[in-house]
Amino acid sequence: MTSPKLDRRQMLKLEAAAIAAAAAGLPVPALAANLATEREVSELKWDKAACRFCGTGCSVMVATKENRVVATHGDIKAEVNRGLNCVKGYFLSKIMYGHDRLTQPMLRKANGKYDKNGDFTPVSWTEAFDIMEVKWKEAMKKRGPNGVAMFGSGQWTIWEGYAASKLFKAGFRTNNIDPNARHCMASAVAGMMRTFGIDEPPGCYDDIEATDAFVLWGSNMAEMHPILWTRLTDRRLSAPHVRVAVLSTFEHRSFDLADIGMVFKPQTDLYLLNAIANHIIKTGRVNKDFVAAHTVFRRGQTDIGYGLRPEHPLQKKATGAAKANDSTDMSYDEYVKFVSEYTLEKAAEMSGVPLNRLEALAELYADPKTKVVSFWTMGFNQHTRGVWCNNLVYNIHLLTGKISSPGNSPFSLTGQPSACGTAREVGTFSHRLPADMVVTNKEHRTKAEHIWQLPEGTIPDKPGAHAVLQSRMLKDGLINAYWVQVNNNLQAGPNANEETYPGFRNPDNFIVVSDAYPSVTALAADLILPTAMWVEKEGAYGNAERRTQFWHQLVPAPGESKSDLWQLMEFSKRFKIEEVWPEELIAKKPEVRGKTLFDVLYKNGQVDKFPVSDIEQGYLNDESKAFGFYVHKGLFEEYASFGRGHGHDLAPFDAYHKERGLRWPVVNGQETRWRFREGSDPYVKQGTDVQFYGYPDGKARIFALPYEPAAESPDGEYPFWLSTGRVLEHWHSGTMTRRVPELYKAFPEAVCFMHPDDAQEAKIRRGDEVKVVSRRGFIRVRVETRGRDRPPRGLVFVPWFDESKLINKVTLDATDPISLQTDFKKCAVRIERVNVS
């Protein structure tokens, strides 16, 4: 693997990197130092960029020399990270320079022509688009618009996601486009929409320094959001009264700081949340004035199923599956009666958490003098009742009035750098449009069609195929042309053997993967398109606290690599309107006849109205040079017009290149820290104090939702729970981080974390190879009985970053029926020792 070309004189060891690396058990040789301070190096060109990894939204300073990134360090001007980076962030300068970086389009060929069983062969971009054009048109002729689909990403830049959504929803006229944020943030979206009628957190990171208590629900912030964890740790250690509660199905590094650590049985978080609400009511700590003025009560639909195939027995039994998102009015008294059965005593019995710890947790929320921030990530969201979990934690904050004020915040932390900015805000989900609009709402479609200058009826009125459904439809031959960008869904998607891989190799299907490296998904495709990464293109991300951040293109992409944005827009030139729109639609706007999708979607007088001369002097911009106008500015300003004036306001384009990000809504140049709060949020009417303006009545919803069991639980044949997740050193499927030598060496392969007593009982020793077996498949992996992750008896944890140990061959493709997000935290497995002969 290659590393940045800096000689010894050009590199000094970075103390902060050494500290962070030591915490992760990392060696930090001289070559790994990532902050240059000698005069020669400090004269390099430095510029800001958002970090390429998680949704925290750290800002970094990037040094370039001779068209190459040679160093990075934390941006001391950034409010989010204040000059710090986690260990992944310290090695950002190496993610683009793996030895197997893709630089040419590659098509499967045999005897000089495309063959699904052929070998990957370098081809030109023209030939790549030629075969794509043929396959797209064949699929649409055979099955109509829904014969094609796209799987995108929370790692798309804002304009990449926006351009992709336009191409599919307006151009090809299919809503079969979904981001991999379906696997990480869909439950958070649905939870916000159900409770508040509008998406994204009411608070911000400033709450960390203002609160009295942190409660982590299914969130290992110490490893998954380490920069926020440093801020949380600083608050805890500098203010003796502050308390930290951590809830998880197994112990992890965040427990090291916990004052109240709680390991609960999988799925019983539903019970715990209701029990806390009941405790608040029983002890007379409901903020009655707040509840009366700002909330109404709803009874949610129950027995909603598990998002499995319709013929699955669990789906057949689910009486409420068809109306999973429905709810009905109820009174406060009826809600009180509903939660009364959820006592702390029963919760302790159900969950396995000691009663005294549950009482201490409940008191943090109930005490009116204690400000509380609730953080959660995949433990809540990757859950067959993930939306319910989100609703139930909002219930607690609403009952106590602990919301939308400094130090009081329910906060879903984001996993990807722009799952908020691109997937949620742009609306790249199969049911969404920009600014919280949805395809099922005629007024919303009409507004989108007006902004996009399209005839009425262009955008389909039914949601398209979501992530898991796309895999099923590919397998069943109902989607025949498929484009994957910026994700690795063969490694990341559930039940890979039965539901994902078969669709990729279905002979009727043509699969395109745009990637920078030969991932598992890319190697299963028919055509691989080499993609520009990170600062090889101009970009924008939106982080978890509604902060939008921009960066300039700083270096060129290698070889023939092109950005995802260029690929989308260039491919759109291959389609005349007459080839993709019905005659009756064209008749409503005859001037589009003879034009290409590129002309109608991107050269429409709005996207192309900013000249190349608007690009800040001294910066590259390959896409704008190719198309002849400032693409990013035009796309952003058109997109921003969706949200301005109704609570999603973004600042003018040029403002973001000057700032370390701004938190929307941005009105009159001022960002918003606490939404729904008078004096902070410009959309709150004077004299209301708090206004949940997502709903017309200005009130939030408190939901009555019961405990319901998991889709699959351990039994005699499969006696263990399996949970999957991430580790500090690697990000998602490891496509980038496993190509950084220092990160690879720190955690080279996935292991199966197991309780030592379970291992001893099975005559398994630490380091032994075992099979992790489910009803769907198995992997072989070595056992770890010590270290950072400490499962209770009856549960094992296997991270999913390792492509040689595809744990998602084992997982179940059950989803939350409302959000359609996958539950990667709960399925049943057995552990078999591999006998070495």
Curated annotation (Swiss-Prot):
GO MF term list: 4 iron, 4 sulfur cluster binding; electron transfer activity; iron ion binding; molybdenum ion binding; molybdopterin cofactor binding; nitrate reductase (cytochrome) activity; nitrate reductase activity
* Keywords assigned by UniProt, alphabetized: 4Fe-4S, Electron transport, Iron, Iron-sulfur, Metal-binding, Molybdenum, Nitrate assimilation, Oxidoreductase, Periplasm, Signal, Transport
Q: Does the keyword Ribosomal protein apply?
A: no
- What's noted about post-translational modification? Predicted to be exported by the Tat system. The position of the signal peptide cleavage has not been experimentally proven.
Q: What is its EC number?
A: 1.9.6.1
Catalysed reactions, as listed in the record: 2 Fe(II)-[cytochrome] + nitrate + 2 H(+) = 2 Fe(III)-[cytochrome] + nitrite + H2O
Q: Give the domain of life.
A: Bacteria
Query: What is the role of this chain?
Result: Catalytic subunit of the periplasmic nitrate reductase complex NapAB. Receives electrons from NapB and catalyzes the reduction of nitrate to nitrite.
Q: Which family does it belong to?
A: Belongs to the prokaryotic molybdopterin-containing oxidoreductase family. NasA/NapA/NarB subfamily.
What name does the UniProt record give this protein? Answer: Periplasmic nitrate reductase
Which species is the source of this protein?
A: Bradyrhizobium diazoefficiens (strain JCM 10833 / BCRC 13528 / IAM 13628 / NBRC 14792 / USDA 110)
Gene this protein is translated from: napA
